[in-house]
Design a protein with these regions (language model features):
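Short acidic/histidine-rich motifs immediately flanking catalytic phosphotransfer sites
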Residues: 68-75
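A short, well-structured beta->alpha microelement
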Residues: 48-68
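Alpha-helical scaffolding within the catalytic cores
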Residues: 2-4, 61-64, 95-98
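The substrate-binding groove and active-site-proximal loops of carbohydrate-active enzymes
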Residues: 29-38, 76-92
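Residue-level signal for short, function-critical loop segments
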Residues: 22-24, 62, 80-81, 116
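Hydrophobic targeting/anchoring helices
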Residues: 1-44, 138-167, 172-174
């Protein structure tokens, strides 16, 4: 009890928002029964965020349209296509894409995990592909002229001995992505 009387825990100024369909309604959870389920990236992101010295909020797509981005530095969108975690049909709203794009242009950081901003029916599968620098070819079109790139290791980017599972069908959207 006296531990908490000493004040708030150390926190840096970075404010992170997790963007999904429910916003605050599903803060820090994935419906309760997905604990330690490897298929849901967001549970691992929540676990990581809970140990970082950052302020974390959970916002919905309606919150984005209402101006919630002015209060955050980083937005994380994670989940598989069509899910409420990734956003599903919320990505069909041009206002959401426009506000996030403008926010990134003005210095915000958008982080996508798994199939962020994914929705079919547009020129890109990831609606934020122009920000992410990557998109997914779902087989609905043929990707001719893919950007060629060399893989260059970046010291300190990943912890020693760790790895990231590859995913087929992804391609760079321009020659500037790193």
């Amino acid at each position: 009890k006296s531990f908490h009387a000493q004040g708030a825990p150390l926190s840096i100024k970075t404010k992170v928002a997790v963007l999904h369909s429910w916003g605050k309604l599903r803060s820090w959870t994935l419906s309760g029964h997905f604990h330690e389920t490897y298929m849901n990236d967001l549970i691992h992101i929540n676990e990581s965020l809970s140990g970082l010295p950052v302020d974390v909020s959970f916002i919905s797509f309606e919150d984005v349209k209402a101006g919630a981005l002015k209060d955050v530095d980083v937005v994380i969108n994670a989940g598989y296509a069509g899910s409420a975690w990734s956003g599903g049909d919320n990505w069909k709203d041009e206002e959401v894409v426009s506000k996030l794009t403008e926010w990134v242009y003005n210095g915000g950081t958008f982080i996508g995990v798994d199939e962020p901003s994914a929705v079919a029916g547009y020129d890109t599968y990831f609606r934020m592909a122009h920000v992410l620098g990557i998109d997914e070819d779902t087989g609905a079109r043929i990707c001719h002229g893919k950007w060629q790139y060399d893989v260059s290791p970046v010291d300190g980017l990943m912890p020693e001995g760790s790895s990231i599972r590859g995913r087929s069908g992804l391609y760079l959207t321009d020659g500037n992505a790193r």
